[in-house]
């Protein structure tokens, strides 16, 4: 949130009815012996990513289960990210190999793809008229978001190039 002030800016405040349940949820987790973590000013995905990396350093294999596709960027040789497809009945297991097979990109490129496409749920505007197909094509040609902008001058004139230039700060 410090890198991009508008990040998640359109998100509604957590309803009081839900917030009131937090103490009961914490108590239930304690009684079940399930560790839980929270830290002011940090979102759950930040904590999940940090704990996952710490577990990897201790030679643990990690499985993250979530409905948040943003967590796909955390997949690596020791981390599988299971994304729910239909409620909690069906999951899709993302590994670096599966991401490459499914989309043709790496976990690092997944982050860049999101920057190019934007994400309304996180209030990330992205580049005008860049969707998944075009974003992936650009990443395959240039390797990364940085690579796209390093080579922008050699791209032929087009509306896409114009949008990339005009929306650079949004990517």
Regions found by a protein language model. Name each.
Residues 35, 57, 78-80, 90-171:
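Non-catalytic nucleic-acid-binding/docking modules located in mid-to-C-terminal regions
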Residues 1-65, 69-93, 169-171:
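Noncatalytic, basic helical substrate-engagement surface that gates or grips nucleic-acid strands
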């Amino acid at each position: 949130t410090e890198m991009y002030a508008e990040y998640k800016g359109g998100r509604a405040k957590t309803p009081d009815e839900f917030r009131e349940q937090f103490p009961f949820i914490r108590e239930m987790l304690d009684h079940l012996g399930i560790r839980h973590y929270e830290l002011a000013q940090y979102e759950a995905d930040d904590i999940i990513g940090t704990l996952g990396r710490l577990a990897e350093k201790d030679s643990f294999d990690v499985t993250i289960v979530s409905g948040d596709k943003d967590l796909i960027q955390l997949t690596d040789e020791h981390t599988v990210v299971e994304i729910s497809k239909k409620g909690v009945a069906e999951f899709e297991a993302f590994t670096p190999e599966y991401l490459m097979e499914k989309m043709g990109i790496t976990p690092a490129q997944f982050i860049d793809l999101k920057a190019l496409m934007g994400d309304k749920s996180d209030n990330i505007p992205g580049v005008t008229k860049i969707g998944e197909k075009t974003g992936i094509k650009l990443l395959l040609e240039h390797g990364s978001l940085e690579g796209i902008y390093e080579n922008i001058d050699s791209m032929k004139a087009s509306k896409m190039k114009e949008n990339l230039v005009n929306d650079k700060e949004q990517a």
